[in-house]
């Protein structure tokens, strides 16, 4: 409670009664009460890796305690059969064959798993979901974890509400999905591109190699792995870089005069960190992982891949008042600190994409769930202290699964048949004959976009979110685009083969007939425990 009072004195929280008084921007029309959407786009987590045993936590002594509220809905998680007789006991997994097992809070720092396009499909084994250790598993957490974690069986590990405490508490108070997916199989860059365009076809330039692209079946190429954006001053000078054609959601928002921005840690190259690092080498060493990581990671910044929305030199906004607006040299691409500065100056963009500094983005190998928790909680606590909170929604979503085990096979809504790349079932991902189009009208069925891929967490946090609600509607990363299009753009779609044309809505996670005007739900950014709640839930 002392922390709550400190935040009140610092201006981080407002009188709850003032929340309803926040006026909507006069020039922006929306179809819902949501005037500000903040997308926190994190890294490399499958649904079961964070929520497999929700809402039941082990609660060992000395760790943050979690107890679910009465009436908490059930989820499609790890049932007794999956926990005790899992298909990944398959002997083909060799020493890594194992049931799922709990990773303790002290095991927050783990190795990165294999999460490329083809290994993820191979792990699914035609829907048997039984070859994760063989295909995506990588050993290596710190000492003290179960011995199986020193094998490829680490991929079967999961956290519960004693480690990912904040996310479990947000799920109790707001809305989550247990049926949301990576739009395609594969790693960070395709996931980031799908977040903003729903279309990984249309690579128009590839330099220094071609390992991240596959033929689309019509003379063009589809992005299915990681590569830095062409022209970004922080991109690799020797590794592969690519550039995308087509439109993204930023183009549509610009045409409609809707303010928006992508805010990523480390984007401002003039800042000097406390360790003396600056420029593209700005870095932070996590106390949890003991790993130094660059704050800015080029292949996590999707708008940099499009000439129309790129800020290749990382030019600074000419004024805090112009953040989110057209015609400024920053071209809607900013540092994460600019997000806070703009809102404090009374300039809250309608649509904001947030990317944490590397050490806080949740990516195993250099980040972890505890550093990630600090970032997420700090953002949401800050937003709840703003007068605009009454008309704000926060989406928490992920770019890929990192290859971590999840038991649920999603529906394959888009097929692909690229030899050697697509191996989901019998050497392909369906026939590819019904695949969505590419960005060019002549590419009727663009290959290399097998999906939906692995199941990922998806949460909505807002005074308008349903309380303690689990949505079972099938959604994907491009469902966020669809909400933006429906709310600000009168349902206009990106088109040209974008998944936004087939994505389901997230509106069922809201209750637009009822709002909690006094909504405040403040968590501790280190433990994830509730420090203040204005409601009983």
Task: Tell me what each language-model feature is.
Residues 4, 16-20:
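Hydrophobic membrane-targeting alpha-helices
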């Amino acid at each position: 409670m002392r922390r709550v009072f400190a935040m009140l004195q610092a201006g981080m929280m407002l009188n709850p009664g003032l929340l309803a008084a926040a006026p909507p921007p006069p020039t922006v029309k929306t179809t819902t009460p949501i005037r500000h959407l903040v997308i926190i786009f994190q890294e490399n987590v499958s649904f079961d890796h964070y929520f497999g045993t929700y809402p039941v936590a082990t609660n060992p002594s000395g760790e943050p305690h979690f107890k679910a509220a009465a009436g908490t809905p059930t989820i499609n998680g790890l049932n007794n059969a999956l926990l005790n007789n899992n298909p990944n006991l398959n002997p083909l997994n060799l020493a890594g064959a194992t049931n799922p097992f709990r990773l303790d809070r002290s095991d927050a720092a783990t190795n990165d798993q294999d999460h490329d396009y083809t290994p993820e499909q191979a792990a699914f084994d035609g829907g048997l979901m039984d070859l994760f250790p063989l295909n995506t598993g990588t050993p290596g957490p710190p000492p003290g974890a179960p011995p199986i974690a020193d094998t490829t069986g680490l991929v079967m590990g999961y956290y519960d509400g004693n480690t990912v405490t904040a996310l479990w508490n947000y799920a109790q108070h707001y809305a989550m999905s247990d049926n949301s997916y990576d739009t395609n199989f594969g790693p960070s860059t395709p996931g980031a591109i799908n977040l903003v365009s729903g279309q990984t076809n249309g690579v128009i330039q590839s330099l220094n190699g071609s390992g991240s692209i596959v033929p689309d079946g019509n003379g063009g190429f589809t992005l299915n792995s990681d590569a830095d954006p062409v022209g970004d001053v922080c991109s690799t000078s020797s590794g592969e870089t690519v550039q995308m054609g087509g439109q993204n959601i930023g183009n549509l928002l610009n045409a409609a005069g809707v303010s928006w921005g992508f805010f990523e840690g480390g984007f401002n190259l003039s800042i000097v960190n406390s360790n003396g690092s600056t420029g593209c080498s700005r870095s932070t060493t996590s106390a949890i992982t003991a790993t130094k990581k660059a704050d800015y990671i080029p292949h996590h910044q999707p708008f940099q891949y499009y000439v129309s929305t790129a800020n290749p030199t990382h030019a600074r906004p000419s004024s805090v008042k112009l953040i989110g607006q057209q015609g400024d040299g920053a071209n809607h691409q900013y540092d994460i600190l600019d997000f806070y500065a703009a809102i404090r100056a009374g300039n809250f963009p309608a649509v904001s994409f947030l990317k944490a500094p590397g050490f806080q983005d949740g990516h195993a190998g250099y980040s972890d769930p505890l550093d990630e928790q600090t970032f997420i909680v700090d953002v949401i606590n800050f937003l709840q202290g703003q007068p605009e909170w009454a008309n704000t929604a926060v989406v928490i979503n992920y770019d890929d699964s990192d290859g971590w085990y999840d038991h649920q096979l999603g529906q394959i809504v888009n097929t692909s048949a690229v030899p050697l790349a697509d191996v989901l079932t019998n050497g392909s991902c369906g026939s590819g004959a019904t695949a969505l189009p590419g960005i060019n009208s002549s590419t009727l069925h663009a290959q290399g976009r097998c999906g939906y891929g692995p199941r990922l967490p998806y949460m909505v946090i807002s005074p308008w979110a349903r309380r303690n609600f689990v949505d079972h509607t099938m959604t994907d990363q491009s469902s966020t685009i669809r909400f933006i299009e429906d709310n600000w753009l009168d349902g206009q779609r990106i088109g040209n083969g974008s998944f936004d044309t087939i994505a389901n809505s997230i509106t069922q996670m809201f209750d637009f007939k009822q709002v909690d005007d006094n909504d405040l739900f403040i968590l501790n950014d280190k433990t994830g425990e509730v420090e203040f709640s204005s409601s009983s839930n």
